[in-house]
Amino acid sequence: MDIILLERIPRLGQMGDIVSVKDGYARNFLLPQGKALRANDANKKHFEKQRAQLKARNLERKSEAQKIAEKLDGKSFIVVRSAGETGQLYGSVSTRDISEIITSAGFSIGRNQIELNHPIKTIGLYLITLSLHPEVQISVVINVARSASEAQRQAEGETLTSAEAIYDIQEKPLAENQEEMNDNDANSINEQA
């Protein structure tokens, strides 16, 4: 099906382009969302009349998105979740969770603006891309941790997936422990004799 794009769509085209897409993609997504029109003579004439208005509206949305992007780009958000000793979460962090955290910080971000291929299931730092506008994309850091103090340590670059790192255990290697035990045993034998 041939359609006229009403806004820039990644991997498809710019506003005003006439492109050919699969019928289902046009009928189920592009046309209902108001992102495209069927490419017939009547719609082509209508689009040419409305082109200036559409461009002005697009520029306005883009400038609003850029203002938000300046404030939000590169920010870090902490997500506290329960997890096992290996760092595996009891549950996951999805686009809904990320949207709620960013919204609670005072920014209006919808779930559909977050590009996350699959839910986050382990603790760590994740770079997430947000599409505020088809032409404005930014990145934020999501810090998934078991506690706020752990998130701070993680942000400083510490790896927190081993038991030693989680509980701040400072164990000596097994060989050193074995030598100390042998020295202690030898001393106790000498004392008994």
From Swiss-Prot:
Residues 184-193 have a biased composition (Polar residues). Belongs to the bacterial ribosomal protein bL9 family. GO terms for molecular function: rRNA binding; structural constituent of ribosome. One of its GO terms (cellular component) is ribonucleoprotein complex. PANTHER family: 50S RIBOSOMAL PROTEIN L9. This is Large ribosomal subunit protein bL9. InterPro entries: Ribosomal_bL9, Ribosomal_bL9/RNase_H1_N, Ribosomal_bL9_bac/chp, Ribosomal_bL9_C, Ribosomal_bL9_C_sf, Ribosomal_bL9_N, Ribosomal_bL9_N_sf. Residues 155-193 are annotated as: Disordered. SUPFAM superfamilies: L9 N-domain-like, Ribosomal protein L9 C-domain. The gene is rplI. Keywords: Ribonucleoprotein, Ribosomal protein, RNA-binding, rRNA-binding. Binds to the 23S rRNA. Pfam families: Ribosomal_L9_C, Ribosomal_L9_N. One of its GO terms (biological process) is translation. It comes from Bartonella quintana (strain Toulouse) (Rochalimaea quintana).
